[in-house]
Amino acid sequence: MKIEKLVLGSYQTNCYVISHNKMAVVIDPGANGEIIGTLLQNNDLTLEAIFLTHGHYDHIGAVDYLYNLTKCKIYAHIGDQELMDKEASKNILNFQTLEIHAPIEYFSKEFESFTILKDIVFDSIYTLGHSAGSV
């Protein structure tokens, strides 16, 4: 398993690409979908899923780009569904609204396990505080 950290966008959001056996999961694709897409392509990786730790603008910016590129699954906690559905997160500093058109699979448990890369399990722990759906 390989974990690669990318620092993306004007907010310098940490994005993680976790890969194993030519499959990948992206955690918090904040911006610059082209950079993430190039990394996937250059390493011959198939994006299986995007996992969002919360729905703030600076963590979801490349969701649609990557979904349109790969048709991967997207996971987020249901606590942030309203945030992402209403205006899909607003960048208050730039007065922009980011709309997400990709389908998001919301989960609601405080502790959830996902087997995404066949033999690797990802555990999500609900951590209310930063947003209503922080994990």
List where the protein language model places each region.
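Catalytic core of the metallo-beta-lactamase
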Residues: 1-45, 101-135
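Active-site HxH/HxHxD metal-binding segment of metal-dependent hydrolases
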Residues: 32-120
